[in-house]
Amino acid sequence: MDYLKAINDKFITFEKLILTLCTIMLVLAIFIQVICRYILMISTPWAEELARYLFVWMSYLGGGYALHSGGQIEIDIAPTIINYLKISDDSKRRIILTLKTIGLAITVIFILCFCYVFSNYIMFIYRGVQTSQTMGIPMWIVYFPVLIGSLITVWHGIYRILLNIKMGKGDN
């Protein structure tokens, strides 16, 4: 399990670096857009397009980090109900852990299906000649970080499933 933790730590470092760079670029693009529009009175449509793409990239690349840190949206009605049951605390913990593991497995399966469909879409776009309107970037490059972020989310989901299984066996 230690080698998986090392791989996961590398992914986290990579994600933090990419998200930090995207945030800096996003702030700079918006800053340039505001300065050019309101002070220099010139239009910079590329800055708006870049900011839009960076925001989408950050959303998908940040999804894996959110899953890793437990920051994703989840419905916790089942754990709340289970905590009111008159069973031992260990049984409650195991049931809640099992439900969370099942939820993670469903999430991973859904994202894998999304990755399959989206990779076919990217290949379709790659064969075409579509480019972004203002910057002229090939659209497959624009969409590619969505696939990468989804695959990283799958990795974090599988890693958390393995951690839950390890915790369920009592190997803390």
Task: Identify what each model region corresponds to.
Residues 1-172:
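Alpha-helical transmembrane segments and membrane-interface helix-loop junctions
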